[in-house]
């Protein structure tokens, strides 16, 4: 790939991330599940995390079995998604969607790759999720502080 082509790809990626963040910050108000997140989940996640997927409770009982059938915990509703944001599996959504910039190893979460078809789309969708969550943390329920929990916005409407 030529230097000019690389510059063009980088410029498009930066512009996409900037535009996504700006659209949320200006004019649209705070990011919400209904307005911003639901569409991303529908387009990128529901083939494995839809209404035919197991509840979190059922998934925990047979994770390997469900993984073999390409089924993860159900994310088809706001309530089901919130289990992985600040519920019984606090931080799971953030750990799995993170691009690796929140870890010392720099390794993206195992579901980051499904956030979009291109790096620019993945980055833009991650920006939306981060704005929606607010207090983006990779900590588990037993590790998270009260202040960090309060920083999680994750508005439904």
How would you label these PLM feature ranges?
Residues 18-25:
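Sec/Tat signal peptide C-region and signal peptidase I cleavage site
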């Amino acid at each position: 790939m030529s230097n000019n082509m690389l510059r063009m790809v980088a410029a498009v990626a930066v512009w996409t991330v900037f535009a996504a963040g700006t659209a949320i910050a200006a004019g649209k108000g705070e990011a919400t599940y209904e307005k911003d997140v639901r569409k991303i989940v529908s387009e990128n996640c529901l083939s494995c995390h839809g209404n035919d997927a197991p509840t979190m409770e059922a998934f925990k009982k047979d994770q390997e079995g469900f993984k073999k059938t390409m089924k993860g915990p159900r994310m088809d509703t706001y309530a089901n998604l919130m289990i992985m944001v600040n519920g019984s599996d606090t931080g799971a959504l953030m750990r799995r969607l993170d691009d690796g910039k929140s870890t010392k190893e720099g390794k993206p979460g195992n579901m980051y790759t499904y956030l979009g078809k291109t790096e620019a789309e993945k980055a833009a969708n991650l920006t939306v999720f981060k704005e929606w969550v607010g207090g983006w943390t990779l900590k588990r329920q037993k590790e998270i502080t009260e202040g960090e929990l309060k920083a999680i916005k994750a508005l439904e409407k």
